[in-house]
Each structure stands twice: as structure tokens, then as C-alpha cells.
């Protein structure tokens, strides 16, 4: 039988519920338990797929092609269980399903209400997503007290009543601020946050106390007294050197043992040696490199969360400190490429829309002509093709129809037909909705023998995740290949270009897929590892 841990947040948002949930899950997994994590998002969008990166940050793509919250990226980086479309749902998704049932007549003419219909649908999805796990952590987005979260919290309350307190508990993450002028931490915000929980019928069983400073024993006793939480269940969670040090921190405070005892589970001792090795490598690098990342969402780095972590993971695997220089592509358009001169390697990530595209194209040209290691991802591959077409193949008007609908030389165009993650044929037109209409999820890719990328992976057939609706136009491939561009990866059916490489260059790889979605701190990723190694070689050779 599955046990449920409902994770809520109080006082302020962005305290790190996702990291806390993932860290506890990692410890429980290290004790031999099968775990999973769900994220319940209270916004009315059906999914984050059409939301601006400035609003929401990264859209994380799962193996089965779901566009989900970036917290699912944290979950996959901390535990071995792959996330699916069942691990994340929103208010919009819930209401969409309930309204569909009402239109179909499933409610037999009854009045459709938040309770029981919306809460029942939430409970159904939680139980479905948690099926098969020994322990499921359910992270409720937002902050206790927000009107948007109320249906989710009520559904969690009901589910705990239904399964019993031996199979469910509430873990509340709250802020314990340090007031510098007073020289002490303050517990009052936590007390008020728990009071807010009680007002809707919820009593936390565990409190995680986020603070810049250690929450001392006397403060924990005070919190326990005024919140009706067992003292040993008031767990400090102060700022750490790295998020990957948090599993060890929480384990030393006894959080996992508390959960094991509460649920009556039989579990072995936690083996956190892999996490200790990750932190040791991260904190004791033997070299360092500087990567220039040229994108258009630099005002909110969460838009590139998985990518930033992937470079960090590559540094862990190579014992290299990876310094990232974040550069807005519009700055390249305005001021030129001199800002790239200090970089040991250059990366252009994915993105949407015309703004900043010419700056990315100029970045590619700089990397190609100056033999600087280059990694292009998604749009980063498309601009690499455009740059090569213009400056090497002689297609001076080369562009993408995403940015120039009537360009005379559309070297990148809309995909109209492809196979999805399950092998089913998908078709799209210019009139299709934006939401959920991209080529999404894991796809097989066949690499070319002798290419740089096959040297990274060490095998010819790989499987990586996609999120795009534009592709290289096959009509122009003969002209591009004649000019020297190497097509070093194609889709399994051979119809879509997945990887290109530039000739006579030490390391120039551009891929249509998103390798950052499968990188983890314990395993790294072969493409990012190869990229950082190329940056090291360039640094030492310069």
C-alpha cells in the first residue's frame, strides 16, 4: 500500500518545496524504498507549455512527452524513478476533465461543485499517479492561505482521512527569518503559517524550517510548543553549500527515520555515498572553464534550469568548476561578439520567437570561425544551420519560417508529420493550436559513425527528449552537405535531421533534442561531459 507525504509551503513562496521533496525522496530511495513525487500546480493553465519563460521558468519535458513544471526536473535529478504525465497536473487540467465529464453526462444531471467533484478528481489523479510506490510525496504548489490552492489542500485533507493517519502525513515547509538588527531568528511567521493551516482543517506532522542560519534547539522547542508538532519533527533546513548536500543534511536531522517510523515501514539504512561523492567532486574541482551561454531569457535563469544543472553535472564528472557567463543575444546584436572572447566554449540553448535570433546567428559564426567549442540545443541547432547556409553554402537569404514566414530560402520549417514517443503518427499545420502540438518526448536518434557526437555517447542509437515544432528543411540538405555540413544524427525513420556538425572544427555539435532533460548529478550526461572536456582542451591549447 502506498503511503502519502503531502508537502505544503507557508509564509512566502520559493522556499524550496521541490528540493525538499526531492531530497527526502532521495533518502527514502537510498533506504531501498520505491518512491515517486507528484506536483500539483494551482494555476488555471492546462499545462505550462504555452507560458512565458519569464512567468514560469523552464518547461520540463518528460519521457512520455508531458510539458511539466520545472520541479519535475529536480525530482528526476534526485531519484531514479522517471516522471510521467501523471506526476504533474494543474487546476486547469482538473477543471477541463470535470467539465468534459459534465458535458458527457457522467454526473447524471447533478450540480457540479468544487466539493465533491473537483476534489474527487484531484484525489483520483493523486492516487493514480502514486500507484505502485511505497511512498509518494505530493507537493502542493503555492503557499498555504492562497485561494488558488484551497481545492488541492481540501483534497489532500480528505485523502488523509480516507487512507488513515498511518498512511499519510503533512510536511510543511516554512520560513524562519533571521533579523540582523536583533541578532536572532524569529518563529512567529511559522506559528502563524501553522495557524493558517489549522483554519482549513490541516495539522502538520513535520515542519521543515528554512533559514539562513541554524535553527537552534530552543527555537525548535518553541516552534514545537506553539504548533503542536513533536519536537523531533521540527527539522532545520538552513542554506546549504549545494542542493545536492541537502539529502545528507536532512538524514542527519533524522527526517527519513521519522517517516519510516510513522509509516511502520521496514527499510535498510540509508546509503548516501553517491551523494557524498557528488558533493565532494563539486566542492573540490581540479580545474575550471568558462562557458558563454547566449540566450534571450537571461533575466530569469530558471528558464534554463536543467541546462545550468547539466553543465554543473558535467563539472562534477570531470572535477571541473564550470563558470557560466550569461549573455543576452540582443547584446550581441547591439555590441558585437567581443564579449565572447573570454569563453572557453559557447552554448546556444533553445527558445522561441524572433527576438535576439540574429545575435545567436552571429554567436554561431564566431564559434565556427574561431574554432571555439560550440554546443547548440534545439533553436541552437537551427541557428547553426541558418548561419552555415548563409555564410558557407551561399544561401544569403536563409532563415526559418518561424521568424520569416515567406523567406525565399527556408532552411528551417514547420514539421507537418512525425512519429510521437509511442510510435503513433502526429500531424500539424500552421492553424494548429500552440498548446500540446509540438514534437514532444523521447525519440530514437541514429548517429553517424565517426562523428564527434557518437564519440561522446559511445553508441550509434540514442534516445533523447524533444520539444519543438520546426526542423531542418530536407529540401536544402544536398546544398548544405555539398558545402561541408555534416548530418551526424537523424530520426529513426531517417526523415528528420537531429544533429549537425561543422567540418574542420575541434568540437562543433548542434542537436535538435534537449539532452539537459536526462542529465543527473550522479550520472552526468555524455554530451555535456564531452562539451566541458572540449572547453578544457581549448583552454589549455589557447
Curated annotation (Swiss-Prot):
Q: Where is the active site?
A: 378, 514, 516
Phylogenetic placement of the source organism? Bacteria, Pseudomonadati, Pseudomonadota, Gammaproteobacteria, Pseudomonadales
Any single Gene Ontology cellular-component annotation: cytosol
Q: Which gene encodes it?
A: pyrG
Name of this chain's protein: CTP synthase
> How is this chain's activity regulated?
Allosterically activated by GTP, when glutamine is the substrate; GTP has no effect on the reaction when ammonia is the substrate. The allosteric effector GTP functions by stabilizing the protein conformation that binds the tetrahedral intermediate(s) formed during glutamine hydrolysis. Inhibited by the product CTP, via allosteric rather than competitive inhibition.
* Amidoligase domain: region residues: 1-265
**Catalytically driven reaction(s):** UTP + L-glutamine + ATP + H2O = CTP + L-glutamate + ADP + phosphate + 2 H(+); L-glutamine + H2O = L-glutamate + NH4(+); UTP + NH4(+) + ATP = CTP + ADP + phosphate + 2 H(+)
Q: Specify which residues bind ATP according to the UniProt entry for this protein.
A: 14-19, 71
